[in-house]
Amino acid sequence: NKKKNNNTKSTVYFDDLIDKKEKFHKYTFVKSNKSSFILFTSGSTGYPKGIIHSTGGYLLYSKYTCIKQFGLDKNKTILTASDAGWINGHTYSLYGPLSIGATTILIEKPISLISEKFLKNILFDLKVNILYLPVTLIRLIKSVSSKKRIKSIYLETLGSMGEPLSKYIGQWFTKTFSEKKIQIVNTYYQTETAGIICSPKFNDNISKVPYGSVGKP
């Protein structure tokens, strides 16, 4: 468990919500191909379609991409500012991090991160190592933030999602939040794919993928 800091208001710790006397809870074994959940597409291509994700395959892919794309492990903390209605909200806010044993931060309203004070409190008080934001939110943060840099010594990886990342916004994102210039994990995914299918990796120092590109499949 991470050391708590009372400076971050409206923060609820999972350990405070569960019965600490019960270290293990009952669970049921299921087959790997058993349906886990149904998530509907946005409907941008017509009538929304319900996508069924299986238990074993989905969990394995969630864990794999968290490790490979972001470098997540059980000693790190990830903040994925995605609504639960998006597949990324399922995969990179919940199932992926928890399957690894990492710490994940759930934001009830991701738009609240446009408050510079709130964002800094989250990043510094909760020692966020991986910050994964929608490009729309990155632009909004830039539009309302001061010109001061919010550099955190804890941040190791930055990620973007949702729409193309321009070079201008990408450079601002890196310059503002990281101590050193790091590769942005600019991601492409679909509801149907369960998670990321194209992106640079967190430690990609070879291909030099340009901003706005998600690389090759």
Features from the language model and the residues they span:
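Conserved AMP-binding/adenylation subdomain of ANL enzymes
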Residues: 59-77, 87-129, 143-145
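Conserved pre-ATP/AMP-binding loop-to-beta segment of ANL
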Residues: 10-11, 17-40, 47, 71-77
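Alpha-helix/helix-capping structural signal
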Residues: 56, 136-139, 163-164
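Conserved S/T- and glycine-rich ATP-binding loop of Class I adenylate-forming
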Residues: 35, 41-44, 66, 78, ...
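Short Gly/Pro-enriched turn/cap motifs at secondary-structure boundaries
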Residues: 27-30, 188, 210-217
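Structural core segment of the AMP-binding/adenylate-forming
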Residues: 1-16, 134
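Generic beta-strand/beta-sheet core signal
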Residues: 38, 51-54, 81, 87, ...
